Amino acid sequence: MFTGIFKKNINSKTNTVVSTLSLLRNHNLIDKNKRYKIIVNKRIPVFAGLGGGTGNAATIIKYFLKKKLSPKLLDIFENKIGSDLRLFFFNHSFQENLKKIKGFRKKYKFYFLLVYPNIKSSTKEVYSNVKRFNSPLKIDPSKINSKKEYNKFLINEANDLQKIVEKKHKKIKTILNLIRFQKNCLFSRMTGSGSVCYGAFQNRVSANLAMKVIKKKFPDYWCVLTKSI
């Protein structure tokens, strides 16, 4: 059962909650004869690139399996649900490739301004237009020891899918430029295959001021402030 402002965009018969329960039953991990009532307060947009559906799946898996999720089972769930599922089982980490997650040595606090421009971006369509991906990382982020070095690493990173989406939806670039030029914004980028645009800030005050600018310019867009954990 879905509640919340974005519940109308969810298909009640085909979603990650239904898929996850089905997988758990098929692998005899939960009782096939029992039915469960799961309520999801859908407060983030669909087709936003924020991993909301995958996060729901990970939460259900953690609840039923506790700490008994083997690497083999994780591979099975990941193949059916999404390649980003693995990330939800690690804290303060990055995905080096589809199968490898690494953790950072230190935690650094950032504030993120998220803007959803009411664009439903199809992951399948975006990936079908990829000609090539950037070269692998030249440095190992897990060995970063300072905030300055960490900031530099993030700023120099890029989303290979961003230009593809910008080409189709011009306002993505407009929003990202507006965010980037706000005071104390480290960088602005698009999430995954889109379409949420975000900016990273080092303090809440600057992020709040930027949010006011964005809300004034785009009053109909979903716009929220969050922070790293």
Question: Could you say what each language-model-derived stretch is?
Answer:
Residues A48-D75, L87:
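DPxDG-like acidic metal-binding loop motif
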Residues Y36-V40, S188, C223:
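Generic structural signal for residues in well-ordered beta-strands
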Residues Y198-A200:
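Short hydrophobic/aromatic beta-strand micro-patches
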Residues M1-A48, L65-K72, Y108, Y116-I119:
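ATP-binding N-lobe of GHMP and related small-molecule kinases
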Residues S12-N15, F88-F187, Q202-K215, P219-D220, ...:
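Conserved, helical-rich catalytic subdomain that frames metal- and/or nucleotide-binding sites
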Residues N28-K37, Y63-I81, N203-I214:
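Phosphate-handling active-site elements
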